[in-house]
């Protein structure tokens, strides 16, 4: 089959080489965007008098036929035509004849593919933003139901201080809020039209780039044609933002995996988000959480792959840039699906509040409360720290906890300790008293929830 760019060539191509160079197997995902870009381009060509109105009408009609066929799944693509751009041009030629050749006036595949990617990513990121907003709403709802659910707070995966489970959930709400802000802020760098940059240097035709950008819903055009076709930093930024987002999902998934284990039993995932074992009948595995954790590495790989593709490219377009799409497509699908799966897990999981709180009774996470108690009575904190540390050692040797120590022994340890110490050492009291701004105290949690709701 004759190639659309074959005028300069005499030798025949070979199918196996065509297959290696073709991108239609994956860039056909952008068929809708490619057709939209072509419709805007032909309208601009007619407006500027570069093609006649009748030619524009024929081309437009042909493109709309292709849009209808695409919606019905009736378009067939070929590796002989390499990519989505040449495939559509060939299909258009079959629909309307030689006038289809005028569509590519004042346009290169270089600005065409860049335009397609900007359009595709803009719409896909908007969908991810909506999924992320939904997840944030789910977290707020779950936190609101667990303000007074007490759990161990951890450092080094060791019990540190008791906290509200809502406080833990709202910590991730803050992380996902920053993820949302990064994605929303990045849209202005995606929402730029490279169309009209042509191959690299612009065109000799009197085009109106602002008009085609307006038709496509872009907010701006690239100010430099070379920049417009050469860079993929808008994709790298998306991949970077996605990597941070997936990292946050992965951290939470790691905790869910731990919490669902027999050793913790803090939460239970519904059957829909769990799987069994082919040999062990009792198993209920948190596979969806594990998959999100695993897919995080995949998204990281897409980021590093894209950075590596670009790091040595001289301006302007190089065929290496064909490798910019699969990682972007994969990341978009992975992030979107992961967000929806994760939101479903959180929304439906059962919280074992009694087990969580009981866990705080069998540790020394209230040791800081005793040290603070002494400090508030005038004992220098470092001295109080030393006193409590020695008492913890003594308790571990005797197999008891701070709340089990006899009051008479507390007075031997320090005469300023009074009988209210047992109330101070209670987990719920310890949590409630941490009412500094941003703390885990119940009053602060209600403030945080109110603030969070304002941002939903």
UniProtKB/Swiss-Prot annotation:
Keyword flag Cytoplasm: yes
Single Gene Ontology MF annotation: argininosuccinate lyase activity
SUPFAM superfamilies recorded: L-aspartase-like
Origin: domain of life: Bacteria
EC number, UniProt record: 4.3.2.1
UniProt-listed GO biological process terms: arginine biosynthetic process via ornithine; L-arginine biosynthetic process
Keyword Signal: no
Annotated catalysed reactions: 2-(N(omega)-L-arginino)succinate = fumarate + L-arginine
InterPro entries xref list: Arg_succ_lyase_C (IPR029419), Argininosuccinate_lyase (IPR009049), Fumarase/histidase_N (IPR024083), Fumarate_lyase_CS (IPR020557), Fumarate_lyase_fam (IPR000362), Fumarate_lyase_N (IPR022761), L-Aspartase-like (IPR008948)
Compartment list: Cytoplasm
Primary site of residence: cytoplasm
Pathway the protein contributes to: Amino-acid biosynthesis; L-arginine biosynthesis; L-arginine from L-ornithine and carbamoyl phosphate: step 3/3
Keyword field: Amino-acid biosynthesis, Arginine biosynthesis, Cytoplasm, Lyase
UniProt GO cellular component terms: cytosol
Record-stated family: Belongs to the lyase 1 family. Argininosuccinate lyase subfamily.
Name by which UniProt lists this protein: Argininosuccinate lyase
Natural source organism: Listeria innocua serovar 6a (strain ATCC BAA-680 / CLIP 11262)
